[in-house]
């Protein structure tokens, strides 16, 4: 009867930890390099919209710049099988900022769709869910498709552009931070106004500084959340292994100190990092929602250019965190019930030492 009771307790712990561990598998979707329909349970989906005159002009300018880069790439190293005139068609050029594109973003990868046709999925690497780095990577991948040097491995150019973007952003942020301490010399040099600076020029330079700081903050935030999530998954694996070892201890029939203590520690750490990761994910999603256009048009800055929706992966994350909140008190109650009291352990140690001394005397 006692064995059956312990087996039921361990089975419950095993099933709960196994379920929460398996619910991490969708986080590794959206990274398939194969064609067809790769599975993608995204944390969120976003599309670019031109909701105002400002965003329309901004997006149009970027698209024209990417069109120019596409032409240069084709002229300097085009070697695909298409006829030369067809290579300059719009469908063969970089379309990162096309309004029909839908980006499905996950922790470790993203998928890009154009309407109902899914184009490709690739890994984010350490950039996490940073949408700016994602767009830069997409530009690099598409340029790689147009280049003879990278047409067989387009991810190389995408990763190179992301590395250049992050390095340039870090250097620019450091320079602007130092320039503030020197009295904003850069705007004065650029505008050639000496020590004088108009209100319009000052507001423009401040907006530029805020834009760089925002992009730099998003880059750091997503990198930190990326490594926190990896550590969270690692703790989840250790927690599952601890439950298995704890089950062997229950079957053996002896109360332990080490295994129940480890179970309490790993379950506590798991919930802490899972809560941090979930809170950061939710905060990031809410920040992106602020870049959506207001349907009423009451509150607007003119720069709302995203349409963001929570994905199926976010719902799975909510379920997983809920299971982990249930698992923590159960793990503590079970560990406290089957842990060996310190007094009893001390008494056992004393008896062992007495037996050893008796054996030596004999």
Swiss-Prot record:
Kindly report the protein's main subcellular placement as a broad class.
membrane
Q: Which UniProt keywords apply?
A: Membrane, Sporulation, Transmembrane, Transmembrane helix
* Example GO BP: spore membrane bending pathway
Membrane-spanning intervals of the chain = 7-27, 233-253, 268-288, 313-333
Cytoplasmic-side positions: 1-6, 254-267, 334-362
Record-level GO cellular component terms: cytoplasm; prospore membrane
Check the UniProt entry and state the signal peptide residues, or none.
Answer: none
Q: Which parts of the chain does the record assign to the membrane side Lumenal?
A: 28-232, 289-312
Compartment(s) where it occurs, according to its Swiss-Prot or TrEMBL record: Prospore membrane
Membrane protein topology class: Multi-pass membrane protein
**Protein family according to the UniProt entry:** Belongs to the SMA2 family.
The protein's job, in short, is:
Involved in spore and ascus formation. Required for the efficient assembly of the precursors of the prospore membrane to a continuous prospore membrane.
Name this polypeptide is given: Spore membrane assembly protein 2
**Source species of the chain:** Vanderwaltozyma polyspora (strain ATCC 22028 / DSM 70294 / BCRC 21397 / CBS 2163 / NBRC 10782 / NRRL Y-8283 / UCD 57-17) (Kluyveromyces polysporus)
Tell me what gene encodes this: SMA2
